[in-house]
């Protein structure tokens, strides 16, 4: 089984944006040293706690600071961009760093709808298959207009998704499929089964290939790993509540996270009005727990057992690990991720 890394480039509490980028590069360097398969960088917009807004620039910076590591987009949210410009950008990257660039493609906006408008997102996600065909045409140089220097280059394409719709598309195109179970695991088993059942061999890929995104936090003991994982819980709670706080230091325990959230939601009662914060709290917790259900957290032995359980549920070829660890010491982060294999 292969192991790779997805980095959303989070900004830790007390960090500048430049320091967050430096942390991203440091992790990539260590990933290269320990033989990680690939290193992808996400695309997110209008999120002050993530620095992954200009993905192609971050990929170029990472490629420039590593020697052999394959670096890619996890992914390009194609409806946000002109396929022509994407071809030019990634063709240029492949020209500068041959055989090291990968192109993961998704259809989600990676942001809210107001920001999508600011991105000039005028296309519907239903156009996604046509946009992929257009983009691939530029690399094959089969479109009426050429996009240099991408013409004739063979950059690996991957389809990203969190639904069965993306599974059908990846299968139809005969491309590798990366499922976003690190934040949307609900349809994981169904999507992977659909992809494998409907896969059509292509000139690019003879057999189906599945990458599963997982949240991975490994420490010396289960207790230490669970404490480190409170930073992950806080991160997803911020997503649910749209708080957009920077990555927070760990709390003593998971229950402390929810006690603090409950306390933060306490409101004064005015007359007969009784604000029901408990149902809101319960809903937030349920959503966070659902989003993080595909997580490998614990000692190396515990994570190995969890990984075996995951393999019994889903037929995958590669794990792509995301680690929300506040520490910021890249060796510790990469060491923890590496224990997954």
PLM region spans:
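N-terminal beta1-alpha1-beta2 module of alpha/beta enzyme domains
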Residues: 1-66
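Active-site mouth loops of central-metabolism enzymes
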Residues: 7-22, 76-84, 151-161, 219, ...
């Amino acid at each position: 089984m292969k192991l790779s890394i997805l980095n959303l480039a989070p900004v830790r509490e007390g960090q500048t944006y430049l320091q967050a980028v430096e942390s991203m590069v440091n992790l990539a360097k260590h990933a290269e040293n320990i033989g990680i398969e690939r290193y992808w960088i996400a695309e997110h917009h209008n999120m002050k706690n993530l620095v992954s807004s200009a993905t192609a620039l971050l990929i170029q910076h990472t490629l420039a600071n590593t020697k052999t590591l394959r670096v890619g987009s996890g992914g390009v949210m194609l409806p946000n961009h002109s396929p022509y410009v994407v071809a030019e950008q990634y063709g240029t990257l492949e020209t500068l760093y041959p055989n090291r660039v990968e192109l993961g493609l998704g259809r989600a906006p990676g942001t809210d709808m107001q920001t999508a408008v600011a991105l000039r997102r005028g296309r519907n996600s239903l156009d996604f298959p046509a946009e992929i065909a257009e983009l691939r045409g530029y690399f094959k140089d089969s479109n009426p207009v050429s996009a240099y220097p991408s013409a004739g280059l063979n950059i690996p394409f991957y389809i990203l998704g969190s639904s069965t719709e993306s599974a059908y598309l990846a299968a139809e195109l005969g491309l590798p499929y990366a499922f976003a179970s690190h934040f949307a695991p609900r349809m994981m088993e169904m999507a992977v089964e659909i992809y494998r059942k409907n896969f059509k061999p292509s000139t690019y890929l003879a057999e189906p290939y599945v990458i599963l995104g997982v949240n991975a936090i490994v420490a010396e003991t289960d207790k230490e790993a669970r404490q480190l994982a409170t930073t992950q819980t806080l991160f997803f709670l911020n997503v649910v509540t749209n708080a957009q706080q920077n990555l927070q230091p760990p709390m003593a325990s998971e229950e402390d996270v929810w006690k603090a959230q409950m306390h933060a939601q306490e409101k004064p009662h005015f007359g007969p009005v009784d604000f029901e914060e408990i149902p809101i709290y319960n809903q937030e917790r349920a959503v966070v727990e659902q989003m993080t259900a595909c997580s490998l957290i614990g000692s190396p032995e515990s994570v190995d057992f969890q990984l075996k359980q995951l393999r019994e549920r889903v037929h995958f070829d590669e794990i792509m690990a995301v680690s929300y660890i506040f520490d910021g010491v890249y060796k510790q982060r990469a060491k923890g991720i590496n224990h997954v294999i």
